[in-house]
Amino acid sequence: NRRYIGNKHKLIEWIFSILDKECDKSGSFVDIFAGTGVVAAVAARHFDEIVLNDFLHSNHAIYQAFFSKGEWSREKIDNIIKDYNNINGEDLEDNYFSENFGGKYFSKNSSKIIGFIRENIEENKANLTDKEYYILISSLLYSIDKVANTVGHYDAYFKKNYIEDGFFMR
């Protein structure tokens, strides 16, 4: 579950009640404003092909993780995430993410961990299948949303004296 302004989750029942009446549930389903993909996830149970559209690159990564066909190893992903969750932010040097987002959107330590993980995924991309790469990126995105010091978008953050460390990748 991601924090997202457009939340279509509440509309799913209504959307599919209309589709039940008006459409042959086979062939293709196109989600023009796919957002987090919540509508497409339900449509995937009913249609042969799903086409998703969104202008955010982060959403493209999530679509690849959830909807693309491809080889991946759950054990490999679980082990990588386990290793990431054993990282202590105090042991890391500052990185692009911590310098730009630490102390505002995230605690300094959480932002160092997030930045390290993002760089590490990219550095190890050659050792991952495309699906594994996008699963890790998506897991990072969802985990970031859980600890973000925002209301769901990154135009502004809560101005606090203390931001709790709490990053944990799922």
Protein language model features and the residues they cover:
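S-adenosyl-L-methionine
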Residues: 1-28, 38-46, 62, 69
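Class I SAM-dependent methyltransferase "Motif I" SAM/SAH-binding loop
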Residues: 33-37
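Conserved aromatic-histidine-acidic binding/catalytic patches
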Residues: 3, 7, 31, 102, ...
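Class I S-adenosyl-L-methionine-dependent methyltransferase module
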Residues: 49-51, 55-170
